[in-house]
Amino acid sequence: AAMSCLLEVKDLNVHYGAIHAIHDVSLNVEEGEIVTLIGANGAGKTTILHTISGLHKATSGNVTMEGNNLLKTEPSKIITLGMAHVPEGRHVFSQMSVEENLEMGAFIFSKDKSGIEASIKDVYERFPRLRERRRQLAGTLSGGEQQMLAVGRALMSHPKILLMDEPSMGLSPLLVKEIFKIIEEVHKQGITILLVEQNAKMALSIAD
């Protein structure tokens, strides 16, 4: 069966002030794929993700997801279309508990309490370590656990596609393996992944 295109980026140009950061980038992400953007740091890969998820304005080009023009869509609305973004540097709410962090992930789009509880349960099944630490402040977790939490929080919105920016950044080789295992498991559950990664070897080992 032909895969359907979930996300299409066409002739994307992005400026930061006078700097032309993204130059005519086009890419297609088919449903069910893992697509990896590899390149030297500062090569604008993060900017591509930010532009796709509505955090940065494009100068020209098109970004469409299932027929929706993302360049004209609010970031909060993009989440409800089924896109979740795990930014680089493991952004967690450090003064909140693990569980509160997960609730924040759901809060943006859902006020349905039983639904949120079921989603949290799903995340805990995927990441038993987060369940063990659910009352702990996120800021006291290890780097690897914070990355798990960042992924878990993104999954709370039941995304069709997950954008991940440098998930291996600053983690030990052992944890990098663990994070990539997590990415593969998430992918097995039918979630499409667009990954920015400097660790080319790891990234290529899982990319389609």
Question: Residue locations for each model-derived region?
Answer:
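ABC-type ATPase nucleotide-binding domains, specifically the catalytic core motifs of the NBD
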Residues: 17, 35, 73, 98-118, ...
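The feature captures the beta-strand-to-loop junction immediately N-terminal to the Walker
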Residues: 38-40
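Helix-to-loop junction immediately C-terminal to a conserved catalytic motif
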Residues: 53
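Conserved ABC transporter NBD signature motif
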Residues: 61-69, 81, 115-120
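ABC ATPase signature
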Residues: 96, 141, 154-155
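Conserved ABC ATPase signature
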Residues: 137-141, 145
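A short, proline-enriched helix->beta-strand linker immediately N-terminal to the Walker B motif
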Residues: 156-160
